[in-house]
Amino acid sequence: MENFNLMAEGFDTDKRLDRAKIIANKIKSHIVDGHKKTAMEYGCGTGLVGLQLEDVFNKLLLVDSSAEMINQVKLKLSKHNNPNIKAYCCDLMVNAPELHHVDYIFLSLVMHHIMNTKEFLCRLHSLLNDSGRLLVVDIDSEDGGFHAKYPDFQGHNGYEHSYLTDLAAEAGFRKSAVETFYHDIKMFNGQESPYSLFIFEAVK
């Protein structure tokens, strides 16, 4: 398994930065009246995606279960004063102090690490205001090559679109839509593993 506390300090590679810019722009294209809204990014890591959206929302909460990832976020925040951004270290499946009543929740390459997807979607649903929106960027179903570097990876090898749509309905979301928008290749031990990313939007 990836140890995100150990990965935090060197997490911001050029590859991740480039991909995060594309993801942030895609998420931004789904935001309506963001300047009036409160948003939360869960699994924010070092803030690669979320901090690119800091001017989009009225208030932004950056949340991660890794203390070291949040330390990296706080270090970045200390270098430019934006009182509308707050960073929290917590596991949403255990506790979520001060995180209720948000208009948007967005996640990038996070959900496939969480075993019980339906339970997680139910939890996110409970944190949204009525008509709030969930935006999930994650991996299309693949053969496991994305995590080939981690042989004991215990999450999901991506998702089928129809599976997520059905789970979202079961979790209480009124409507949802999904589209693939990004294609790339991961290399490990000289082996190429093509993968693609989708954005999934669900409305409470």
Language model feature labels by segment:
Residues 200-204:
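C-terminal lobe and adjacent flexible extensions of AdoMet/dcAdoMet transferase-like proteins
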Residues 40-94:
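Class I SAM-dependent methyltransferase SAM/SAH-binding core
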Residues 119-130:
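A short glycine-rich, Lys/Arg-flanked "PGG" loop and its adjoining helix->strand segment in the class I
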Residues 106:
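A conserved beta-strand element that flanks and buttresses the S-adenosyl-L-methionine
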Residues 109-110:
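Short catalytic micro-motifs in class I SAM-dependent methyltransferases
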Residues 12-18, 40, 135-199:
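C-terminal alpha-helical "lid/dimerization" subdomain adjacent to the S-adenosyl-L-methionine
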Residues 1-34, 49, 72, 79:
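Conserved class I S-adenosyl-L-methionine
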